[in-house]
Every structure is written in C-alpha cells, then in structure tokens.
Curated annotation (Swiss-Prot):
Pfam family, any one: Glyco_hydro_15
Zinc in keyword set: no
UniProt xrefs under PROSITE patterns: GLUCOAMYLASE (PS00820)
Cited SUPFAM superfamilies: Six-hairpin glycosidases
Enzyme class: hydrolase
Protein species of origin: Methanocaldococcus jannaschii (strain ATCC 43067 / DSM 2661 / JAL-1 / JCM 10045 / NBRC 100440)
Protein family (similarity comment): Belongs to the glycosyl hydrolase 15 family.
UniProt name for this protein: Uncharacterized glycosyl hydrolase MJ1610
C-alpha cells in the first residue's frame, strides 16, 4: 500500500483525502478556514460489512496526470472500487466519481454505503441532519449547510446520532438502514446506500456530490444548486480540465526543454505547481499546508513568499500579486508583520519574526524583476517603504526576535540574511519609483550589514558561522546557509561559507540520508527535511556555477554533491507531493504533506536560473 493521501480544491474549497480514500476534512468558505471535520467512510455489505479501511483491500492512490483529480483504488478478490475526487474551478462542490468493476465470472449483488459524521465549523454546535424528498441528505447549523446527493438513485438512508442506537454507523454494520428522516445533536451522523447489481466482468459508475453553502434557512437554494450541478456535471468537469490544461500550457513556456526530457522531474514539477495553486485563497492568503496535525493552515509571510516566488518563476503572476495585496492590507503601522494569520486576515500568533519581513520584500522584488511592472512598485511603495524602514532599525540595533523555526529568541544568521536581502530588494525597487535619493539610509545600512554580520557571526575556532549571537549559539543549523543562499549577504564562494556548508553536510547521519535542521532537533523525532536538503543542494549548485565561471578545477565536486542531494529529494516525492519531513528510519512522510515550502523549494531548484532570485 502507498500511504499518501491528497488534496483537491479550488480557491474557496479545499478537501483533504486520507490514506484510504476517506474525506478527512474540508476547508470552506476559504482555503484553510473554516475547518469542517468530515469523518466519512465507504462500506460494502455482502452478508457482512467491509469498511474501506479493512486490511484485505489492496489500496493505491495517485493524481491523474495534468489534473487535480485524485484517484483512490481499492481492490479485493471480487471488485475494483475506484474513487476519483475533484473540486471544479467553477463550483464549490466536491465531486466523488465512483467506479465499480466486477472481477468475477458471475453476477454480483451487494450494498454500497456512504457514511458521514460531519462536524460543521471551527467550533461545532448542535446541528440537524435531514433526508429530503429531493433524494439528498442535508446537514446544517445556524451558519452552514452541507448537501450530499447522487446522480444514482439512493435506495436507503438513515439520519441518527453517532453514539446512540440510531447511529447510521451501527446500521451499516447490520446492513440495513432504519430510514429515520431527521436527527439533531452535537454528533449527528447519516448514511446513504445503493443496491449494486453488476454482471460478470462489467462496471458501473456514478457521482456523489458534497455541496457546502452558507445557510439562511432555505433548503431550496442548495437543492436547486445541486440539481444544476448534477445536470451539468460533464460540462463542469470539462471546464476544469481545460483550465488545468491551460495552466500546464503556461508552465511549459518556462520549463527548459531538457527538463521535459526527464519524465519524472517534469511530472513532479507539474504536480508541485498545481499543488501550490490549491493552497492559494481567493482573498490572497497562501496557507503553509492543508494540515491540522501539525496545524499549518495559516498564512506565514515566509512560506507565502517562497511559494509566490516559485509561482512567479513559472509564469503564474496573478496569485503573487494577490498575495502582496493581502499582506499589504494586514501590515502593522510600524512596517512589520506578525508571525502568522488566518486566511481572513485576522492575526493568529503575534510574535515577530523579522526574517518574514525581509522575505516579503525579497519576493516582491523578484516579482518586479520578472515582470518589469513599475506600476506594481508604485502600488505597493507605501508597504515597501514601511517594511524597509522597520528592517533598517532592526539591522542597526541587531534587534533579537524569534528564529524561523519558531523555537528560540535571539539574533540569528538566517534572520540577518533575510534582513539584508529585504533592504537590498527595497533599495533596488526604489529606483523604479524615483525614490533612491530619499532612501540613502537603506543603502548605508546594507553596507553596514555586509561588513558587520560576517565579522560578528564567524567562529574562529570552528572555522564556520554561528547560528545566532546574543545569545551565542554555535549549533550547526542548515538555515545558516541563508547568509549566502538565497540572500547573498556572504559570497557563495567565501571560504568561511564553504566550510560552514561542509560542516552542515557532515553533521547529519540519518539511516535514510538527507539533511535535517540541526543535529539535536527533536520536532517529530528529528528527521531529514525536504527544504533543508534542497537548501544545501541549491547552495552547492550555486557554488559550482560561481567556481566554474572562475575556471576553478574544484567546481565539479559541488555539482555532484548538489545532484546527489536533489536525487534524494526526488526519491521522497509521493506522486509529486512533498512532505515537510521524511522519517529518519522508515523513509515515510512525516508531519504535514503537502508542505507548500517543500514544493516551492523543489520548483526553485528546477527553474535553475537562480540569478533572478539572488538579491
């Protein structure tokens, strides 16, 4: 079995599909907010019940190439049950296309059940589940309503309470639904069933529709909407297919022809981009990951900046622009941003991580350099100026803050690199709006950092750079690479930086390989990360290019190192999805998957022409 799971969505509705093909939860009406725990299940009843999580299914999962349709195949000795999940670009509905194939040389008769134990909203309250004469189930509270229907006639139903005798779950275990039409409570559940009859070696298919809306007390609005979607399902699907085809076509313009010759890299590149698009909300926020454990369904300026850059590099310009508009609206009066936000713009964690401020300015400058759009700089100049002025004060005072890993407080190498890059990018953009003369202090601060940071962070005895000063932390940490890549405060071929990178490489001895954050890491047990492995790979590739330009005979070894690390990352792509971490012993995904930053770093590597992102 391939333990993977996936996501499907548009810019308002995002669904997480679990390892067994179950719907774990939905985000609606925005990507990442609110959370609706679905707890769905499929079951087959043929004299006894067989749930989709039972051991004797052979389960595989994958995306259909060049689409955001996620396919789960459950196979046993009698049937092949295939579920194709997708959310169309035009409608906020999850469509589950169910295919059932009879493998035997005889006719099959059994029941198929769809079960839900949906908890609506961030703070679930009493809700009601009801079977309507229209042939669908509705579940609602005072704010939202969900409608579950099918284009195949429903043969039976049950509305009950999960931990009571009326539970639809218990009914499925018995194979007969009681057909109670309504139930209210905190933990209502429901089920619908179909009597399946399939001739030998034949197949049948039908759709299950899950439609969420805001609720004003009128059932007819959502039931009419469901009918429209059901009657036009093929057109809705074709519209989405054409949209995805257009996206891939645009991406192809920015992928080097040689890259397209490597089918695996090309396939992962397309999937990584399409995955990032599903993390982008219609209001401009970009969530770090569609994950609840750990809870990453929020907007971090850092993660959003890396994702914006990745999208920009491959020609997707409107989403980064929308992200910058979102960040501009929520910027603090002093020019800073808080640690993270809900996608509706409300603050969640209120600490300051200065590196995020620098990252946002860096991403804005990359966008400007790729587009040459001076009006973009004019539109956001107030945002840029406030952020740069904040960074200048931080830089001159070496002001401490929380590190990018959100674990420690101090003055960090990565943070100072991001501060330098943010100031340099703001200074660069000032020329586009004829403001260079008014921001000369930024230029002086850039030179100050260029001189002071290497001097203050260098450890003479260890012959490498420190993780932080004030307090001094000599820990070998992969984020120190940020001083050079991507932020360019220290030259990539500076001998001190090379020795720092080599110390990082030697510090990790995981059974499965890869590079972690720092050797003493205990988060999820301390594992190799996708972003840190790519980070060192990117640094080595950049070093190779610089040394090659200088005809240095030692350049090739760094290209070999870079490729080895990149190949490790390729090995741990799960049908194009990258997690945050890989288990150091088992080689399975750990923590959030997909993680936006992991996918973005892969795309930055694949783009190859890193000059455009170096400040």
């Amino acid at each position: 079995m391939i333990y993977m799971g996936g996501i499907v969505g548009n810019n308002s509705l995002l669904a997480k599909i679990g390892d067994y093909g179950e719907i774990e939860y939905l985000f609606y009406p925005q990507v990442g907010y609110e959370t609706h725990f679905f707890d769905s299940a499929l079951a087959v009843y043929d004299k006894k019940v067989k749930w989709h999580w039972d051991d004797d299914w052979d389960i595989t999962q994958k995306y259909i190439e060049e689409t955001n349709i996620f396919k789960t195949i459950l196979e046993d000795d009698k049937i092949i049950l295939t579920i194709k999940d997708f959310v169309p670009v035009s409608h906020n509905v999850l469509i589950r296309r169910v295919y059932i194939k009879n493998k035997l040389d005889k006719k099959l008769n059994f029941k198929l059940f769809f079960y839900e134990n949906l908890r609506i909203g961030e703070n679930p309250i009493t809700n009601t589940v009801k079977f309507l004469e229209d042939g669908c189930i509705v579940k609602y509270n005072g704010k939202y309503i969900f409608c579950i229907g099918s284009d195949k006639r429903i043969d039976s139903f049950q509305c009950g309470n999960r931990y009571s005798k009326t539970s639809a779950y218990i009914d499925i275990e018995n194979g007969i639904l009681k057909e109670h039409k309504e139930s209210s409570g905190l933990l209502t559940d429901s089920a619908i069933s179909w009597n399946i009859k399939i001739d030998e070696k034949r197949s049948l298919a039908f759709n299950i529709y899950i439609l969420p809306q805001r609720f004003d007390g009128d059932f007819s609005i959502i039931t009419e909407q469901l009918k429209i979607i059901m009657n036009n399902s093929e057109n809705i699907k074709n519209l989405s297919m054409n949209y995805w085809k257009h996206i891939i076509g645009e991406i192809n313009r920015f992928i080097h022809p040689e890259l397209r010759q490597n089918n695996k890299i090309y396939s992962i590149t397309k999937r990584a981009l399409m995955t990032l698009l599903m993390l982008c909300d219609k209001e401009g926020g970009i969530i770090a990951a569609p994950s609840l454990h750990p809870d990453y369904r929020y907007v971090w300026g850092r993660d959003g900046s890396y994702i914006s850059i990745a999208l920009d590099l491959f020609g997707i310009r409107n989403i980064p622009d929308r992200f910058f508009e979102f960040m501009s609206k929520i910027q603090n009066a002093d020019g800073s941003w808080l640690q993270n936000y809900y996608v509706n713009g409300k603050p969640r964690l209120t600490a300051i991580q200065t590196d995020q401020i620098g990252s946002i300015l860096w991403a804005m400058d990359v966008h400007y350099r790729l587009t040459g759009d001076r009006k973009f700089v004019e539109r956001y100049w107030n945002t840029i100026e406030k952020a740069a002025n904040y960074l200048r004060l931080v830089a001159l005072n070496f002001t401490p803050c929380f590190d990018l890993w959100e674990e420690r407080f101090g003055v960090f190498a990565y943070t100072m690199g991001a501060t330098y890059a943010g100031l340099k990018c703001a200074y660069s953009m000032s020329k586009a709006v004829n403001k260079r003369d008014k921001v000369k202090d930024w230029g002086k601060t850039i030179e100050f950092l260029k001189h002071e940071v290497p001097k203050r962070f260098y450890l003479e005895d260890e012959e490498r750079f420190a993780k932080s000063i004030n307090p001094l932390d000599k820990t070998i940490d992969t984020s120190i690479l940020g001083l050079s890549y991507p932020f360019n405060l220290i030259d990539v071929d500076d001998e001190r930086m090379i020795k720092t990178a080599e110390a990082i490489e030697k510090a990790f001895k995981y059974k499965v390989g890869g590079i972690g954050r720092y050797p003493e890491d205990i988060y999820f047990g301390g594992n190799p990360w996708i972003i840190t492995t790519l980070w060192l790979s990117l640094y080595y590739r950049r070093l190779y290019k610089v040394l090659k330009e200088k005809d240095d005979n030692g350049a090739d070894i760094y290209l070999q190192k870079s490729k080895k690390l990149f190949n490790w990352v390729m090995k741990y792509s799960f049908d194009g999805l990258f997690p945050e971490q890989i288990h150091k012993e088992l080689g399975v995904p750990m923590s959030a998957m997909p993680l936006g930053w992991s996918n973005a770093m892969f795309l930055i590597y694949v783009y190859e022409n890193d000059k455009v992102i170096i400040p």
